[in-house]
Amino acid sequence: MGNWVVNEGISIFVILVWLGMNVFLFVWYYRVYDIPDKFFYTRKLLGSALALARAPAACLNFNCMLILLPVCRNLLSFLRGSSACCSTRIRRQLDRNLTFHKMVAWMIALHTAIHTIAHLFNVEWCVNARVNNSDPYSIALSDIGDKPNETYLNFVRQRIKNPEGGLYVAVTRLAGITGVVITLCLILIITSSTKTIRRSYFEVFWYTHHLFVIFFIGLAIHGAQRIVRGQTAESLLKHQPRNCYQNISQWGKIENCPIPEFSGNPPMTWKWIVGPMFLYLCERLVRFWRSQQKVVITKVVTHPFKTIELQMKKKGFKMEVGQYIFVKCPVVSKLEWHPFTLTSAPEEDFFSIHIRIVGDWTEGLFKACGCDKQEFQDAWKLPKIAVDGPFGTASEDVFSYEVVMLVGAGIGVTPFASILKSVWYKYCNKAPNLRLKKIYFYWLCRDTHAFEWFADLLQLLETQMQEKNNTDFLSYNICLTGWDESQASHFAMHHDEEKDVITGLKQKTLYGRPNWDNEFKTIGSQHPNTRIGVFLCGPEALADTLNKQCISNSDSGPRGVHFIFNKENF
């Protein structure tokens, strides 16, 4: 139990608090509309659907307040960089911002469904009551407001039968129009956010996500017409519903039961979302300001396996290891921004990214940089690009541990390129405050060509550690997870050579996936009473495996070995 708490305790606590707030708001506002006399006659007209519509509306306000905060990248980076308010454990929660963003989005979808279905029943009953297709009591309540100097309870004033009457409400009432619009926006945003769409049609995901602007505008004005109505406080003093409701025919004729007066609830949603909307507006202004700063591409390198490297310079640009940036190339698309991990080290006088060509945008950038041509390209022909960032990630904490495991899958090795480069520079400069004592590096890749661009860095590190008589500092395992029979025969023939046939390194390439259980047990036995940071940039399936290994191989007590799992999310 203790090892589970070390890795997941704070995350579970945050989720439980969030779920608890949703339950509290739902129950509280359900009772607000289901018990007080203010809504006594509204309940007589609408039944339990009134409370079932308003309770999820309160939860929607709460979650729509939260949904923007996890995507305020500059705010999160500021919090992450403030050691005074963020310990390592708190920063790990900030690294799960996108996971929380998705959870909040699904909660919004759930409450939207409940809210919409309940209001569909409300509209049907209100329309039926106006066309005398309901019980006499509801009809009598709906007729209040037809005479001069009366305030109405039933917001439907036209006498049009269903389904035409319901459609009329949807296209003439502000709540109906905005409800349809924001629900459609939500459906498009959620359906375009699936993994398949994001990976294969990123542009669709990118553009539909910007429907959030329409969503929040519609949400802010959704309740402006105040169609949910209740009895006024002044009217309740003169007309007590529980004493008068059985004598509806005598209302206005006897002193203790005058005709009740009704008013609509003031809109509240804007009060919930105005703060986050302001923060997000500031976020976008900062991004716009950064995007206008000049970026110079100093070098473009074409690597094997459809990968290019961009080396750039920007005035005032400062970075930490493992951070990422957003890149826009107006020649390819004037609006799209794409995230890329920085592969350079803070000690270098430029910053770089490695881009794998996998979609329309990256293909366009590949051609814009002249990488599809054989001849050398002049620097002035390179496209202009905009850069936003850098932004913090889990990998920033790598120097907070004495022992770390770095696991990269495929192009997921990029953040660790930055880390390993920085380690190399620190050793060259004999950095006195380097806490890190041991690195276990794992790289899993399907294709042999993918290793080529990274091998030079590993060779430099290998040589440096030998010169410093510290070959034990870095232990790396390069795992080839895909090969055919001819390759296997070739590897076997050269197995006894001094250097690896694929990477040129002294450390031999391994074939197949690591036995993670053995790896964790071996590392744990070599470093007792140590907090070991486990950093992954790779697929969710591998993340689940490593997270379970961290939990199962950590000691339950405060002493002993503890594996702390961290995953890149951007």
From Swiss-Prot:
Q: What's the domain of life for this entry?
A: Eukaryota
Q: Where in the cell is it found?
A: Cell membrane
One protein family per Pfam: NAD_binding_6
Tell me the keywords, alphabetical order: Cell membrane, Electron transport, FAD, Flavoprotein, Glycoprotein, Heme, Ion channel, Ion transport, Iron, Isopeptide bond, Membrane, Metal-binding, NADP, Oxidoreductase, Phosphoprotein, Transmembrane, Transmembrane helix, Transport, Ubl conjugation, Voltage-gated channel
Q: Which residues bind heme b 2?
A: 115, 222, 226-227, 268
Mode of membrane association: Multi-pass membrane protein
Where would I find glycosylation on this chain?
A: 132, 149, 247
Needed cofactors, names only, are: FAD
Q: Which residues lie on this side of the membrane: Cytoplasmic?
A: 2-9, 73-95, 195-203, 286-570
Residues annotated as binding NADPH: 411, 446, 481, 513
Presence of the UniProt keyword NADP in the record: yes
Extract one GO molecular function annotation from the record: superoxide-generating NAD(P)H oxidase activity
The chain positions of domain Ferric oxidoreductase read 54-286
User: CDD domains per the record?
Assistant: NOX_Duox_like_FAD_NADP
Which GO terms of the cellular component aspect does the record hold? lysosome; membrane raft; monoatomic ion channel complex; NADPH oxidase complex; plasma membrane
- Binding-site residues, heme b 1: 101, 206, 209, 280, 287
- Transmembrane segment boundaries: 10-36, 47-72, 96-130, 164-194, 204-222, 268-285
In this chain the FAD-binding FR-type domain maps to 287-397
PTM (free text):
Glycosylated. Phosphorylated on Ser and Thr residues by PKC during neutrophils activation. Phosphorylation enhances the NADPH oxidase activity and stimulates its interaction with RAC2, NCF2/p67-phox, and NCF1/p47-phox.
Cross-link Glycyl lysine isopeptide (Lys-Gly) (interchain with G-Cter in ubiquitin), where in sequence = 161, 294, 299, 306, 328, 334, 381, 506, 567
GO BP term, example? superoxide anion generation
Name the enzyme group at the top EC level. oxidoreductase
PANTHER family this protein is in?
Answer: CYTOCHROME B-245 HEAVY CHAIN, NADPH OXIDASE
Q: Partners and quaternary state?
A: Component of the phagocyte NADPH oxidase core complex/cytochrome b558 complex, composed of CYBB (heavy chain (beta)) and CYBA (light chain (alpha)). Component of the phagocyte NADPH oxidase complex composed of an obligatory core heterodimer formed by the membrane proteins CYBA and CYBB and the cytosolic regulatory subunits NCF1/p47-phox, NCF2/p67-phox, NCF4/p40-phox and the small GTPase RAC1 or RAC2. Interacts with NCF1 (phosphorylated form). Interacts with NCF2; the interaction is enhanced in the presence of GBP7. Interacts with RAC2. Interacts with RAC1.
Role noted for this protein: Catalytic subunit of the phagocyte NADPH oxidase complex that mediates the transfer of electrons from cytosolic NADPH to O2 to produce the superoxide anion (O2(-)). In the activated complex, electrons are first transferred from NADPH to flavin adenine dinucleotide (FAD) and subsequently transferred via two heme molecules to molecular oxygen, producing superoxide through an outer-sphere reaction.
- Which protein is depicted? NADPH oxidase 2
